Swiss-Prot record:
The gene is hemL. It comes from Shewanella woodyi (strain ATCC 51908 / MS32). It is found in: Cytoplasm. Its cofactor is pyridoxal 5'-phosphate. This is Glutamate-1-semialdehyde 2,1-aminomutase. The modification N6-(pyridoxal phosphate)lysine is found at residue 265. InterPro entries: 4pyrrol_synth_GluAld_NH2Trfase, Aminotrans_3, Aminotrans_3_PPA_site, PyrdxlP-dep_Trfase, PyrdxlP-dep_Trfase_major, PyrdxlP-dep_Trfase_small. It catalyses: (S)-4-amino-5-oxopentanoate = 5-aminolevulinate.
Amino acid sequence: MTRSDELFEQAKKTIPGGVNSPVRAFNGVGGSPRFIDKADGAYIYDADGKAYIDYVGSWGPMILGHNHPKIRQAVLEAVENGLSFGAPTELEVKMAEKVIEMVPSMEQVRMVSSGTEATMSAIRLARGFTNRDKILKFEGCYHGHADCLLVKAGSGALTLGQPSSPGIPEDFAKHTLTATYNELESVKTLFEQYPEEISCIILEPVAGNMNCIPPVEGFLEGLRAICDQYGALLIIDEVMTGFRVSKSGAQGHYGITPDLTTLGKVIGGGMPVGAFGGRKDVMQFIAPTGPVYQAGTLSGNPIAMSAGLAQMEELCAEGLYQELAAKTKRIAEGFKAAANKHGIPMSINYVGGMFGFFFTEEEKVTRFDQVTQCDAEKFPEFYHGMLDEGVYLAPSAYEAGFLSMAHGEKELEETLAAAERVFAKMAK
């Protein structure tokens, strides 16, 4: 029994399922999760001392790599002044200014402490601003675990939402409509059905919680036009994509202007953080300037702001995103080439520093139903093969992979060589 195995058994006695977030339990791939002791650059190290090339990056925030010296130094300096004040600080002003500088659609910003808090607050604000109750989300898109957002289509894209978890009253879920990602017609039908009841559309501009699904051409533009036509707000959830796919997020990459944006992950440099912002007239509707209430004890935490600002400054370096995208393309295309070489069908998607791969014969995966029809047996086999080779991927076929600027030529070559060996074994 490894030290990770021992820790997992110990954890299950005091923590539900032995983990503090379900995907970490390895239920999607089987076996026991690796307990991590430390991380540096492109590597994480488990409790048994084994090193892994990491393509999870704490689920996205570690875009510069783990334990980056400038971020670490910023945190250490901030700690010297205290951990939390419950009062305004200059750091949170600087963070808001930096976000607004990099994302033009965000005229004002409110800091919170998690992505869930950001999306939950943005939804409440949209409902208050429009005086409408219903929201529209997409099947397979994840926006945190707030009650109104843990909903997917019941019996097709055009049905009223059904709760995806016990503990969510149907009275909450009935106000959440679910459409099919990358299919505008399903959205149009719902707006025709409820023309004056839908407050907003919320979506991941690159769906990173059904693996990695970019928007098809015209999809985001179509959503913008529908919102304008019916007086609804467009909320782009960039908790995952913000400053991950480009300097101005997915909205900058695809040239789309939302009314509200939610952020997290990258803006904290590895610390707990979230934010939402957008049009000034909408943001002025939130307390204390408006009637929509939102608050948080640790919002704008100085340690998180310090870490985030240090990371954001580094992300402004010339050519950084082009280099990151090139690395991501190399890994994704390399996986597909190695799989196909050994007669294993694979489809890939990648945008900026995100990538996904699917064990399927379909040339392109653009919808959630295609993701669910992929080969369910090949992913765990590939996953554990790569884990044995010292490559740490997301332990679920429904999660995107992430690269960092710390992934160099050595790590890329070793990863692709490992994939070649694993696919060769799988083909036997």
